[in-house]
Amino acid sequence: MTTQVVNVIGAGLAGSEAAYQIAKRGVQVRLYEMRPVRQTPAHHTDKFAELVCSNSLRANTLTNAVGVIKEEMRLMDSVIIRAADECSVPAGGALAVDRHEFAAKVTEYVKNHPNVTVVNEEITKIPEGPTVIATGPLTSPDLSAQLKELTGEDYFYFYDAAAPIVEKDSIDMNKVYLKSRYDKGEAAYLNCPMTEEEFDRFYEALIAAETVPLKEFEKEIFFEGCMPVEVMASRGRQTLVFGPMKPVGLEDPKTGKTPYAVVQLRQDDAAGTLYNIVGFQTHLKWGPQKEVLQLIPGLENAEIVRYGVMHRNTFINSPNLLRPTYQYKQRDDLFFAGQMTGVEGYVESAASGLLAGINAARLVKGEEPVVLPPVTAMGSMANYITATNAKNFQPMNANFGLFAPLEKKIKKKAERNEAYATRALETIRNFVNI
């Protein structure tokens, strides 16, 4: 066993995964987490891998790229996916979790590993020696300044928004119905149907509602996958009807007809007492937010247990700075992982931590860091953030468009996606024991 210690900074999804992967390979880890000594604007607990946006890790089937990346991670013994599987709540074809149980489980697995030492303090300078930086989109100002100095260039920044959560008991169940879109999987969503008149009233209130003012020096750049609902609405009346409020596949069983618009609620905890409003990330002020949400049929008297909030995200220009091993180009023993690398999403962040952790462990053991081929989901993400055009670099979710092309063209989308998935999983099995 090597006597070298790897520093991991940040115990979010990526940092927790990186620490676990390093530790299970017989290498000592010093895991730094500034919470609860210093909180972020979006976190509420001192637990590892706290989910601050949705409680969904998105699709869990192999017909979707994020489902493939999950399966790759299962094969690679991901602590994040193991905990998610153990803490899952009903969500149709998606993998959603009880966020409190999930964070507690990840904390338990990582903290109790004999090779992990947890240090609760804020890191303001990049340590010497093998280090994985996984401080996430809410990196503290002091460390951000250090990273800016290290990279020699400005960060990009944008905002992610968290959706409101309501108590199930406060929902008028006579006005909503249980159904998944196109009846896929189990009926896991509560649906609030709207007539055109109800939608118009809601829409006008939404676009007129007061938002939390942003600081003057901060430019608004929103990532499409977690865009505030009021920003979507500002793009035009139909944006919501074709976006988070699209009614297709959600016929009202009482009428047999498709509503004009539908607001979906997804179970947020294992007990089924809390539901989040799908796609309704927002930074409306709390008073106006409550007024707007109570215009949704079934939510007229909704008890909001968590209002939607807004927080800043930060990411580096990875194509200029990183190798596909997640190593910093100018320093072999410095790794980056998580959303700050430009991977977007819970699962993608954890996947980057998995690969960064494996490679940090390999480096200190005198082994070559591994580059996963872009025929795999994890390899395609690493390839995207390091090989795409640096000038227009933007965060990206896992998707089949990032995969290396198939040898033979397949016209039908379902068959093509199946071929991508089969090839990816066949390939990743060659890396299970790295």
From Swiss-Prot:
PANTHER family: GLUCOSE INHIBITED DIVISION PROTEIN A, METHYLENETETRAHYDROFOLATE--TRNA-(URACIL-5-)-METHYLTRANSFERASE TRMFO. This is Methylenetetrahydrofolate--tRNA-(uracil-5-)-methyltransferase TrmFO. FAD binds at residues 10-15. Keywords: Cytoplasm, FAD, Flavoprotein, Methyltransferase, NAD, NADP, Transferase, tRNA processing. It is an enzyme of class 2 (transferase). Catalyzes the folate-dependent formation of 5-methyl-uridine at position 54 (M-5-U54) in all tRNAs. One of its GO terms (biological process) is tRNA methylation. The gene is trmFO. Its cofactor is FAD. Gene3D superfamilies: FAD/NAD(P)-binding domain. It is found in: Cytoplasm. It comes from the Bacteria. GO terms for cellular component: cytosol. Its EC number is 2.1.1.74. It catalyses: uridine(54) in tRNA + (6R)-5,10-methylene-5,6,7,8-tetrahydrofolate + NADH + H(+) = 5-methyluridine(54) in tRNA + (6S)-5,6,7,8-tetrahydrofolate + NAD(+); uridine(54) in tRNA + (6R)-5,10-methylene-5,6,7,8-tetrahydrofolate + NADPH + H(+) = 5-methyluridine(54) in tRNA + (6S)-5,6,7,8-tetrahydrofolate + NADP(+). Belongs to the MnmG family. TrmFO subfamily. It holds the Pfam family GIDA. The keyword Acyltransferase does not apply. It comes from Bacillus cereus (strain Q1). The keyword Electron transport does not apply.
